[in-house]
Amino acid sequence: MLGAGGIMGQAMAANLARSGFDVRAWNRSRAKAEILALDGAFVAGTPAEAADGADVVLTMLADLEAVAAAMDGRHGAIAAMDPGSIWLQMSTIGEAGTGRCAELAAKHEVAFFDAPVLGTRLPAEQRKLVILASGPATSSLRDLVQPIFEALGRKILWLGPAGAGSRLKLVLNAWVLTVVEAGAEIIALAEALGLDSHLIFDALEGSNLDLPYLRLKGEAMTRRDFEPAFRLSLAAKDAALVDDSARRAGLDLPLLKTLSDRLAEGAKQHGDKDMSATYLTSAPKTP
């Protein structure tokens, strides 16, 4: 497991170890992965050490640069993997990034699965992620990764060849990030108009307009509680991937372009906070 010290990766590695898998965990900041030893995981010093002889190598890292460094950089995992083993790539790295990883896997005769997830810290801890799985249809390979997915998530969607998972993840991220930014702006507007922002949720309660996720993030904004479940810096990265895919598809989607710019602006000051901290970019300025 590469990326075992992040918010998502640590929870996922712990659940795999608790489910009886032999987990070798690596993280760039080793100290963040050390706690996994309490669940029986071996904490490796390099990606290559974690991957050596493994049937499956799972990557859950911040971005394509981190994935490339862990897999193909100094002491990278890919050179230590046996031909016929499996690379389970679960980071959100977009279409182009997924294509690059698939090419690297093919070069080393490693089976490649593209399986990003829908969910943040709490679903990861509770094994309630939605797995957007795509990759080889070979039953022997899928039989190896299916139990891993079942230890991590509540729902597994098989979507076709590698790349399909990342494409659906981009579409779903477009929805999630739009909801969060919309929540931030309507709360800021309510406050600027002298209203108690809780009235928004009181008015929506019980109607078809009452989105649970909007309520979850919106109430965090009203409490000014920005403990990270998913960092704003990563939300900005994902929004840029969405915008890039829209442009590659020849679409003019100004809302998503503006969303990407807005989240990038917020991440400059509040990148380590939860993505709901995008509210701080819009919040009325106090004298």
Where are the regions that the model predicts?
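Rossmann-like NAD(P)(H) cofactor-binding subdomain of soluble oxidoreductases
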Residues: 47-52, 56, 64-130
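Helical "substrate-binding/catalytic lid" subdomain
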Residues: 164-278, 282-285
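Hydrophobic beta-strand scaffold residues
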Residues: 23, 43, 111-113, 156, ...
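NAD(P)+-binding Rossmann beta1-loop-alpha1 motif at the extreme N-terminus of oxidoreductases
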Residues: 1-59, 85, 90, 121-124, ...
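Rossmann-fold dinucleotide-binding core
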Residues: 93-174
